[in-house]
Amino acid sequence: MEALLQQSRAMCPFLKRSSPNTLRSLATATRPSTSPGGGTMTNLQRIARRCPVMSKALAVQSARMTGTKRFTSSAAGVPGAGAGTPKPTRGSPGKRALHSTGGNGANMSTEFHKGAQQIHPGLSNATRSHVGASATVSGPTPRAPVAAPFDYDAFYNAELQKKHQDKSYRYFNNINRLAQEFPRAHTASKDEKVTVWCSNDYLGMGRNPEVLATMHKTLDTYGAGAGGTRNISGHNQHAVSLENTLAKLHGKEAALVFSSCFVANDATLATLGSKMPDCVILSDSLNHASMIQGIRHSGAKKMVFKHNDLVDLETKLASLPLHVPKIIAFESVYSMCGSIAPIEAICDLADKYGAITFLDEVHAVGMYGPHGAGVAEHLDYEIYASQDTANPLSTKGTVMDRINIITGTLGKAYGCVGGYIAGSAALVDTIRSLAPGFIFTTSLPPATMAGADTAIRYQARHQQDRILQQLHTRAVKQSFKDLDIPVIPNPSHIVPLLVGDAELAKQASDKLLEEHGIYVQAINYPTVPRGEERLRITPTPGHTQELRDHLVEAVNTVWNDLGIKRASDWKAMGGFVGVGVEAAELENQPIWTDAQLNMRPDETLEAAVEREFQAAVPGMKAGGAKAKPVGSIAANPIGASIPVAAAA
């Protein structure tokens, strides 16, 4: 009681200046209430009614007591109390009536209900007698509240119905990629094989012999799982080695591995944004959901700048005081349109306005740069090409060196799973120590980390896969352009075909799969804005000329069958998202130059592809892979065969 009084005095000036004797006297002296039927009141209550805080508390207390009295009267059988109120049923009309799917209410069985009344054998005798007496008290039981409970199933069904109505419901195709027949897969039936044209395993590293051998050996030695979080038995030599490799790849002091890059982005932005005082995060309008989620979780102020718009970004930076901490969050390659950020110019703005940069290289690591470190490395290609690995001493001032935080994935070009951040030792240690997304989750399995480490080292030594993938991408884009099929212009390895309608995109994807044995996933809202629906194609080193010809022929047929707009149609309408806009074509030249792709003067694209593919064959044999074609395309009308990817 004394502790409660001390706490109350700290909050209330009246209690603070009144002595205990005065309070006791006021609390015991009573007089009739001024309210009809209000009984008596203490003098302390009368004084409290004049207090702006206590008067509200007393009003709430009075309302609760009144409600309790009414409920007790109804339970005691007072005539008219609660009479005529129908008992709610799950089958009654309401939200559920809006849906075609119905359901029967779940009823508790009588036997189960009886069993629930039994007294636990562990109770003491005194407690048994008390519980028994309480259970046998005669009289009616209180009625349940008259309001109907929330209909959870109706809520779920309503949300799903919205997705169906706007054609954004996501369907999942059963696609089982075959390691020895890359880029082939079988569907739910092993006899039904298709060619996968939308995988993010961009280089086929998911079936690379060196990676698989490392994973097999590690799995046999160290088992399936890590055994715990990084702090509790889940930290091991594989994590240490992988993080050292990643830090070296990006020329940073340290790196930290997460279960995915979604978690890495979310955890890092949420932690920095919430811990830095008055932090402001400036985010590109096309940023990935993981970054948007992290910014939201941070609670920091957010400013969204127009996609790749340096003027808009600088305007927003200039509006903020120099002393305020600022994070510019953006991506190098935007995966759904293939655009590439002006990284160096953003670094210039960050330096000018006292901001730090957060660069997501998820769709670029393994794909760009002499060692596969991403677009930031690629922008200084010649400097890094002369290095065995990124050397911080000799690469000071390069674009990659200027980036404060780099995030990437192990699950796309490296063919495994997981995500990471790389930066200064102080930054990485801060995230390691404060980010719940890192602290409270199980570490990646040893075999996964060892496999990813091997994949990164492999791609740092070999340019062949990146070059072949880029040549195949050029060939596919050119073939579509020749047939007036609308490719959204971009300088990267992404091939987005504009459809512009959610239902048509789904139909096109279905027809390619069912009639041509080609798997390309439709991309709809919210991944892309409504009206910008598309098919997203990602060539790999394993997509040979026969496979490319089959794809282009099939897409052309589907476009004709469904009457989907051609590039010339979009041009006649004034152009859209770069399609049908000549300036957009000129501005989006490939980031890989002819010289970087080892193309010879006057050499045709197909000749360069064939030469690079043949150059990859000895390496494939040395890696233990078959150099000759394996498997056949069951649904391919041209009867092509699939060679093992050069990535092997």
UniProtKB/Swiss-Prot annotation:
One of its GO terms (biological process) is positive regulation of organelle assembly. This is 5-aminolevulinate synthase, mitochondrial. It is found in: Mitochondrion matrix. The active site is at K412. SUPFAM superfamilies: PLP-dependent transferases. Belongs to the class-II pyridoxal-phosphate-dependent aminotransferase family. Keywords: Acyltransferase, Heme biosynthesis, Mitochondrion, Pyridoxal phosphate, Transferase, Transit peptide. Homodimer. Catalyzes the synthesis of 5-aminolevulinate (ALA) from succinyl-CoA and glycine, the first and rate-limiting step in heme biosynthesis. PROSITE patterns: AA_TRANSFER_CLASS_2. Residues 1-26 form a transit peptide. One of its GO terms (molecular function) is 5-aminolevulinate synthase activity. InterPro entries: 4pyrrol_synth_NH2levulA_synth, Aminotrans_II_pyridoxalP_BS, Aminotransferase_I/II_large, AON_synthase_class-II, PyrdxlP-dep_Trfase, PyrdxlP-dep_Trfase_major, PyrdxlP-dep_Trfase_small. It is an enzyme of class 2 (transferase). The keyword Cytoplasm does not apply.
